[in-house]
A protein has these predicted regions:
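Short, charged amphipathic recognition helices of the HTH superfamily
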Residues: 93-113, 134
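Short Lys/Arg-enriched helix C-cap and helix-to-coil transition segments
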Residues: 134-150
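Short, basic interhelical loop/turn and adjoining N-cap
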Residues: 108-125
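Residues in the recognition helix of alpha-helical DNA-binding motifs
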Residues: 126, 130
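Long, low-complexity interaction regions most often at the N-terminus
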Residues: 1-68
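Positively charged, polyanion-binding regions of nucleic-acid-associated proteins
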Residues: 77-98
Length: 151
């Protein structure tokens, strides 16, 4: 779901807006590329690989500063997931305040954000976790969707 949302929102390769928090974080995380050595451990890749257009900063030119360590990749992925949840939260709260949050509206949000059908169940699970967290804070969202509508 994250891959679909990112490609739909920022394109492929990912090109973030000039003064975005993503570019600021990338600027902080990139390091000078190290020459590869024969004994290095090969990194295991999970999911789909995305290319990212690095910001061009006067002190950190992308030609030299384009290495993300394993820890930096984890931090950046966590940040992207956080922005996905913020986008979903904004939609849920806006739609719920109008009183029209339904399974169809959640499906429509997924469709409009380029999330494939195979990943929509994951988005629903995120919604239910978010709903539970909001209820713990006293914000009530619509009840669970009827099982007859879930597919």
């Amino acid at each position: 779901y994250l891959f679909d949302w990112l490609v739909n929102k920022y394109g492929n390769p990912l090109r973030f807006p000039a003064r975005s928090p993503h570019n600021d974080l990338l600027h902080a995380l990139v390091a000078v590329a190290r020459p590869k050595q024969g004994g290095e451990e090969v990194e295991q890749k999970r999911g789909m690989t995305l290319k990212v257009v690095l910001p061009n900063r006067s002190r950190h030119k992308p030609e030299h500063y384009h290495h993300l360590s394993k820890a930096a990749k984890i931090i950046f992925t966590r940040d992207l997931k956080r922005f996905f949840r913020l986008d979903l939260t904004a939609f849920v709260l806006n739609t719920a305040s109008k009183g029209c949050l339904t399974l169809e509206s959640l499906e429509q949000w997924c469709k409009s954000h380029g999330i494939r059908i195979t990943h929509r169940d994951a988005v629903k699970r995120i919604y239910y976790r978010m709903k539970k967290q909001l209820e713990e804070q006293g914000i009530l969202l619509p009840p669970k969707f009827p099982k007859s509508l879930q597919s």
